[in-house]
Design a protein with these regions (language model features):
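Short amphipathic alpha-helix that is part of the acyltransferase structural core
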Residues: 1-38, 54-56, 168
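C-terminal "cap" of GNAT-fold acetyltransferases
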Residues: 148-174
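Glycine-rich phosphate/pyrophosphate-binding loop shared by adenosine-nucleotide-utilizing enzymes
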Residues: 59-64, 85
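Active-site rim helix/loop that mediates acceptor-substrate recognition in acyltransferases
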Residues: 29-56, 64-66, 72-74
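Conserved GNAT acetyl-CoA-binding A-motif
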Residues: 113-125
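Conserved acetyl-CoA-binding loop-helix of GNAT-fold acetyltransferases
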Residues: 92, 98-111, 138
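Conserved active-site alpha-helix within GNAT-family acetyltransferase domains
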Residues: 103, 115, 127-146
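A short, internal acetyl-CoA/4′-phosphopantetheine-binding micro-motif in the GNAT/acyltransferase core
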Residues: 87-97, 125-126
């Protein structure tokens, strides 16, 4: 599959978001169950406070990246008043992974944030999720070893996922 930056555009159709979100987060390694209302709330939050970019092959959305303003109350990472943005989701449909879609979406979104005057971008990742950690490291995010967060998975629907896990924070100066 040849990755082309011109295939990235603003994702503004809930159905595109839902298809990718529901597929990615219901399967390995997440195994989460989300209602349509919860997915819509997540979509609306990212549309209201940020932006979602989709990677399209024709009319088909194969993946997306969403980011929104960082609020200090939401995550325990502090940028000392600097304008910062939270990359809340990077999701690619399983059969299109390892083709460079996420690797195209991340720098595209970071360039967009830089042009809006953001000084930092950050992600919150599972500490045992090598695919996410690899994407972050390839894009020069560094881990903040002073900050972590334990998360309980209230949406987990299979026992193959541990009930709690550690989320780590990685950031990048833009």
């Amino acid at each position: 599959m040849s990755i082309n930056i011109s295939n990235i555009k603003k994702l503004d159709k809930f159905e595109d978001f839902k298809k990718v979100f529901n597929t990615v987060f219901s399967e390995f390694p997440f195994f989460e169950s989300w209602t349509e209302e919860e997915i819509r709330e997540t979509y609306n939050l990212n549309q209201r406070e940020g932006i979602i970019f989709g990677y399209y092959n024709g009319e088909d959305c194969l993946g997306f990246i969403s980011m929104r303003n960082h609020h200090q109350y939401e995550h325990p990472i502090d940028f000392k008043g600097k304008k910062s943005i939270y990359i809340s989701h990077i999701a690619v449909l399983p059969k299109y992974r390892h083709n460079g879609i996420a690797s195209a979406l991340v720098p595209y979104a970071l360039d967009f944030a830089t042009n809006l005057g953001y000084e930092y971008a950050y992600l919150r990742l599972n500490d045992d999720f090598p695919m996410g950690l690899g994407i972050a490291k390839r894009n020069e995010f560094v881990r903040d070893f002073k900050v972590c967060q334990e998360v309980t998975h209230s949406r987990t629907h299979r026992r193959s996922r541990k009930p709690d896990d550690l989320r780590v924070f990685m950031f990048k100066e833009l």
